[in-house]
Regions:
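Terminal targeting signals and extreme-terminal segments of soluble enzymes
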Residues: 1-104
Length: 104
């Protein structure tokens, strides 16, 4: 199996096993190739905080999940040791948030 096919299979298996990503948060895996992944999440009512904007924890979860798919695309278990995020502007109900993770 070539590395692109392996990465796609890893992404499918990870997504199938990750109920939090798929069901609880409602993210979609758009692509998973060697060292790269892209995901999306449409901001739903369940994602809104008291200011009626997307809770930062959901945005961080989307980024972290994208990172996980990219880093695990070679079929070697990997987890984050540390990460940080800068929020540039709020996301609102119905916004489509798209992420791309690239291995460095």
């Amino acid at each position: 199996m070539d590395e692109t096919a392996l990465a796609q299979q890893v992404g499918q298996v990870m997504m199938a096993n990750d109920r939090a990503t798929r069901e609880t948060v409602g993210m979609d895996l758009l692509s998973c190739t060697p060292g790269r992944a892209s995901m999306r999440m449409v901001v739903q009512d369940k994602h809104l905080n008291g200011h009626q904007t997307c809770h930062g924890g959901f945005i961080f979860t989307l980024a972290d999940s994208t990172f996980a798919f990219a880093c695990n695309s070679h079929n070697h278990n990997a987890v984050a040791a540390a990460c940080s995020i800068e929020f540039l502007k709020p996301a609102h109900l119905g916004d489509e948030l798209c992420t791309e993770g690239v291995e460095q």
